[in-house]
């Protein structure tokens, strides 16, 4: 292993091992408080193995400490759920990251104290305190820690005699003692393929510059990839997604035991991610290469790795040093040994109480949404920023009526989340479940009212709308940078009793000839969603977006990316037979409300909605006193009252829950 290599060099300069130790010391002194280091040292030393004076952790200890499912491998049973067998994947990651920045020489590293310090700093993004020039983006580093290496079929036939000369990283670590013929992960093997070098090594370069050891780094990083093609296999990616889905709601002080996520929900979500990432067929050995991995994560799942931060911050809290346990010296031994950190939030902590129970959202879907939706600034992740969801409208409870929709949704003056679930409308092929929606940062308005958010909020991604599809494939259409400066006939969302609900569409201007027959919205830009007035059918459009401007960018593009990135090559139209529509209000966090200096912004959307409903109720009562006996007869009065009821001015029958 890398740890067993010589610590001297023929040229007399510092070896990678020495520089790695020095970097770990600098990380420890600059990136942690003394109290955090005390807890970290206690956690490590209390469970470390000792072999010839070398203290380290193995995969079993790491999985047990973090509460990671680790039921496959040698201990697998017929009842084992291999989907949640994330222990080997996580151990491979930390073994690679522990060798930072000398992955070619030292990886896979033994999980010593120095290695764990570097892993925590990298996965919690604390390195900015030391590496001022280092990139915030860890994409290449994370890819390297997850990548498997495969050969083409031609290479396998030509080099069958040399297949066993390279040990896998897991086999290398499982052998006793150090091995002198291991040079690191195969992802870093030299090969001279003539490809254009990827100079996305700012993080590693910054680390070595801080130690004045660039020459050591250059000696270690002679990379080439013609023989070995680095990729993340379908199996590895599948287990990674399952792990991230489960730990998404985890808080740093939460219990490390895995949240009981519905396995069926995970199985339903994962295939859409696999399809969107173009991982290919697992049986044929296809995998996910760096370019695709970087594109998909950047544009479609920008917060995918956020759950790793609170997971590894558990190292900074030791229950053995919990001072709260010493307040009562008379506590029983059982009570003193009980874990003190509070549990991580479940769905009931995210959802506010309301009139209906969701038929769309579950733990896996909510975790899925947290990987790309930005609901606050500067902390975008909805689990980290304490965002709460308030039930606003449900077609299952309030009825499939635009009148009921407008009564509940148009009175909500805060960001909202529109979700619809149904099946594909094509009868010629097998129907598939469809789950689509949109994040709308502005309150709903009738027709085409202009947006009120100023253009100065460009860095605040929570002010940008987002159109997405979660099933049967994962597709995210982010807002165009100039969506707020589009013409008034191209609003983010349009609501009309004649044309229905339109998201990201161009609304034709009204004219005398169309007063009684309003023109239908037209798709524009990279994608649009149109729901008919009956709330029974919808159409989801995705296009290359190059034919005209629009609210949303094509798939594969983000507001900060250049147009040279690969976007969707073809246009597609999906007809959806709607089963359920839900609208959830996004309640701002307390910190966001305190920092909000806009006097016109709603301080409490729930109270404002209730006040508007109370006003409508008073107006309805007042209209009941209108003298309807215009013709002097009871029949005319009954006719007038019936007209008012049909118009929705009096009476509440149109808002009553639909009976099923």
Curated annotation (Swiss-Prot):
Query: Predominant location of this chain?
Result: cytoplasm
Bridged cysteine pairs (disulfide): none
Keywords, ordered alphabetically:
Cytoplasm
InterPro entries in alphabetical order = TLDc_dom
Record has Plastid as a keyword: no
> Key word Cytoplasm present in the record?
yes
Q: Where in the cell is it found?
A: Cytoplasm
Query: Which top-rank group of organisms is this from?
Result: Eukaryota
The residues covered by the TLDc domain are: 359-587
A Pfam family matched in the record: TLD
Q: Where is this region: Disordered?
A: 153-199
Cellular component terms per the entry's GO annotation: cytoplasm
The similarity annotation says: Belongs to the RTC5 family.
Q: What does this protein do?
A: May be involved in a process influencing telomere capping.
Question: Under what name is this protein listed?
Answer: Restriction of telomere capping protein 5
* Organism of derivation: Uncinocarpus reesii (strain UAMH 1704)
- The gene behind this protein is RTC5
């Amino acid at each position: 292993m890398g740890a067993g290599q010589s610590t001297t060099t023929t040229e007399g300069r510092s070896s990678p091992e020495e520089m790695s130790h020095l970097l770990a010391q600098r990380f420890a002194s600059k990136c942690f408080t003394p109290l955090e280091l005390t807890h970290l040292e206690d956690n490590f030393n209390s469970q470390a193995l000792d072999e010839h004076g070398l203290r380290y952790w193995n995969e079993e200890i790491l999985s047990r400490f973090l509460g990671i499912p680790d039921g496959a491998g040698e201990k697998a049973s017929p009842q084992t759920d291999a989907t949640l067998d994330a222990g080997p994947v996580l151990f491979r990651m930390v073994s690679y990251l522990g060798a930072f920045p000398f992955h070619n020489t030292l990886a896979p590293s033994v999980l010593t104290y120095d290695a764990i310090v570097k892993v925590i700093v990298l996965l919690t993004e604390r390195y900015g305190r030391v590496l001022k020039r280092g990139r915030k983006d860890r994409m290449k580093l994370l890819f390297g820690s997850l990548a498997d290496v495969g050969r083409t079929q031609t290479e396998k036939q030509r080099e069958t005699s040399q297949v066993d000369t390279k040990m896998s990283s897991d086999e290398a670590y499982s052998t006793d003692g150090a091995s002198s013929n291991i040079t690191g992960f195969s992802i870093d093997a030299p090969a001279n393929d003539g490809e254009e070098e990827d100079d996305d090594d700012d993080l590693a370069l910054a680390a070595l510059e801080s130690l004045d050891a660039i020459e050591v780094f250059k000696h270690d990083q002679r990379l080439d990839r013609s023989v070995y093609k680095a990729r993340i296999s379908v199996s590895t990616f599948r287990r990674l997604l399952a792990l991230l889905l489960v730990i998404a709601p985890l808080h740093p002080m939460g219990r490390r035991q895995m949240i009981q996520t519905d396995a069926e929900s995970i199985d339903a979500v994962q295939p859409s991610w696999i399809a969107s990432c173009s991982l290919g067929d697992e049986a044929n050995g296809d995998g996910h290469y760096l370019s695709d991995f970087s594109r998909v994560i950047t544009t479609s799942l920008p917060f995918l790795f956020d759950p790793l931060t609170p997971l590894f911050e558990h190292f900074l809290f030791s229950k053995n040093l919990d001072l709260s346990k010493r307040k009562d010296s008379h506590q029983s031994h059982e009570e003193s040994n009980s874990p003190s950190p509070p549990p991580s939030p479940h769905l009931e902590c995210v959802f506010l109480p309301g009139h209906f129970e969701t038929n769309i959202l579950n733990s896996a879907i909510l975790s899925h949404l947290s990987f790309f939706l930005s609901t606050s600034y500067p902390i975008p992740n909805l689990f980290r920023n304490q965002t709460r969801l308030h039930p606003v409208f449900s077609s299952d409870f309030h009825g499939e009526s635009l009148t009921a929709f407008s009564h509940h949704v148009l009175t909500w003056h805060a960001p909202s989340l529109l979700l619809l679930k149904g099946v594909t409308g094509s009868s010629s092929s097998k129907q598939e479940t469809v789950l689509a929606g949109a994040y709308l940062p502005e309150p709903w308005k009738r027709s085409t009212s202009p947006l009120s958010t100023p253009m100065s909020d460009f860095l605040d991604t929570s002010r940008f709308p987002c159109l997405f599809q979660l099933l049967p494939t994962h597709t995210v259409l982010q807002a165009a940078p100039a969506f707020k400066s589009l013409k008034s006939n191209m609003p983010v969302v349009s609501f009309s009793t004649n044309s229905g609900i339109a998201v990201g569409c161009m609304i034709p201007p009204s004219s005398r000839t169309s007063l009684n027959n309003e023109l239908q919205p037209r798709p524009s830009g990279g994608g649009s969603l149109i729901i008919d007035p009956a709330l029974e059918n919808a159409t989801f459009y995705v296009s290359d977006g190059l034919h005209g401007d629009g609210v949303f960018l094509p798939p594969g593009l983000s507001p900060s990316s250049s147009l040279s990135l690969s976007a969707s090559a073809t246009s597609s139209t999906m007809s959806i037979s709607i089963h359920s529509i839900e609208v959830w209000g996004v309640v701002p966090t307390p910190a966001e409300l305190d920092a909000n200096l806009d006097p016109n912004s709603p301080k409490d959307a729930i109270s404002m909605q209730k006040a508007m409903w109370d006003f409508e109720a008073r107006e309805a009562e007042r209209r009941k006193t209108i003298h309807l006996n215009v013709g002097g007869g009871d029949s005319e009065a009954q006719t007038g009252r019936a007209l008012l009821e049909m118009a929705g001015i009096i009476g509440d029958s149109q808002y009553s829950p639909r009976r099923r």
